Regions:
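Conserved alpha-helix/loop element of class I SAM-dependent methyltransferases that forms part
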Residues: 61-116
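Conserved class I S-adenosyl-L-methionine
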Residues: 116-126, 142, 251-287
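Conserved SAM-binding loop of SAM-dependent methyltransferases across substrates and taxa
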Residues: 127-137
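Conserved SAM/SAH-binding beta-strand->alpha-helix loop
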Residues: 147
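S-adenosyl-L-methionine
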Residues: 159-207
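A short acidic, Gly/Pro-enriched loop at the edge of an enzyme's catalytic core
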Residues: 202-221
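A short glycine-rich, Lys/Arg-flanked "PGG" loop and its adjoining helix->strand segment in the class I
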Residues: 234-246
Length: 351
């Protein structure tokens, strides 16, 4: 959850009913509301194929709301955990092909089944969509967010499995929608998944020293679209040293949208002349803390669908990174289109 750079408090814009509505839509999209047909953006032919109807959608615009970003980042981490012993150090010039076949074979064999003894932490969990998806693999998932409103909503979703919200149309006008937890194994799996989740209010920059309060260390940690929206991102990284088990994974997805509105310039990770590109700066920061960056190519390919698989970002130095599309719908005709760089790190030494 974004914070104010001067105080570290939750940014006021995110503690509103409108923010809750937008994030419910992002975390729990339905078939009818993710594809644009509800707004007349797309028509279908007799075979049900989508055709454009007067709206030329940008590549990560309305057509890409189907990517369901919170579920996608969780799916990547679930698969990375299932193949963690096969993940190799990332090649600076690309991910290569060496172990892809082994990873794909493992994913087919294990089918990302539940690891009852494994624990996952979702830092900046918002309204809980990623946490519920992680709970399809991990025996315990703790979601932490600085927003009391978001955590209250996540707990309601945990109890009831659904919640009504409003999609704005014009000003105060809008229509009622329903957010639902939709486990990949079907509605019957909801109770078991919900029971594995625990949602708590907490500051992402103040997790250091909280291992005991959180019940011990974690096998996997998700940090999704958070680093560039907190006042002290390095404190988030510092906490990972004690929060993550040896050989545990940290999956970080970030658009690196650095702004002094949220983060003082001196706290940015990359984004300055002296530091260079943020993905490389983050890699260096994680190296200092005992984490090595690992290859995600086969894992991302298994989690994503066409045409998103080919989305890559190349740094000035030529290093390639997968980017994951995220679309936040503000109202019927306005979308935030975000491409988050995906990086995964394995802890290589004990703290």
């Amino acid at each position: 959850m974004p914070s104010d750079a001067s105080t570290g408090a939750v940014a006021p814009a995110y503690e509103t009913n409108d923010a809750v509505d937008m994030y419910l839509r992002l975390h729990y999209p339905s078939e009818s509301t993710t594809r644009g047909e509800a707004f007349g953006y797309f028509a279908t032919d007799d075979d049900g194929r989508k055709i454009h109807d007067g709206f030329d959608a940008p590549r990560c615009g309305p057509a890409y709301t189907e990517t369901r970003f919170p579920s996608l980042v969780a799916e990547v981490l679930r698969r990375a955990h299932a193949t963690r012993d096969l993940l190799r150090r990332k090649n600076p010039r690309g991910d290569g092909e060496d172990d892809d076949a082994d990873i794909q074979r493992r994913l087919r064999e294990v089918s990302v089944r539940v690891d009852a003894s494994a624990r996952a932490l979702d830092i900046g969990c918002a309204v809980g969509g990623s946490a519920f998806r992680l709970a399809e693999t991990f025996g315990e998932v703790i979601g932490v967010d600085a927003s009391e409103m978001f955590i209250d909503v996540a707990k309601k979703m945990q109890t009831d499995g659904e919640l009504k919200y409003t999609l704005r149309a014009f000003g105060d006008l809008g229509r009622e929608c329903v957010a639902r937890v939709s486990p990949s194994e079907g509605a019957d799996a909801f109770k078991a998944i919900a029971a594995r989740c625990d949602f708590r209010v907490g500051d992402a920059c103040a997790l250091g020293g909280q291992v005991d309060a959180l019940g011990g260390r974690f096998d996997a940690v998700l940090v999704s679209n958070l680093l560039c929206r907190v006042a002290e991102p390095r404190k988030v990284l510092d906490a990972l040293v004690e929060l993550v088990e040896e050989e545990g994974l940290v999956f970080i997805a970030s658009p690196f949208s650095w702004s002094e509105e949220y983060t003082p310039r001196e706290e940015w990770i990359g984004g300055t002349e002296s530091q260079g590109d943020s993905p490389l700066a983050l890699k260096l920061e994680m190296d200092k803390r005992g984490f090595v960056e690992v290859c995600l190519k086969a894992v991302v390919a298994d989690a994503m669908v066409e045409p998103e698989k080919g989305l890559l970002y190349h740094t000035a130095g030529g290093e390639a990174y997968h980017v994951l599309p995220c679309t936040i719908q503000e109202h019927e005709r306005k979308f935030q289109c975000i491409l988050s760089v995906a990086q995964c790190f394995k802890k290589t030494r004990a703290s």
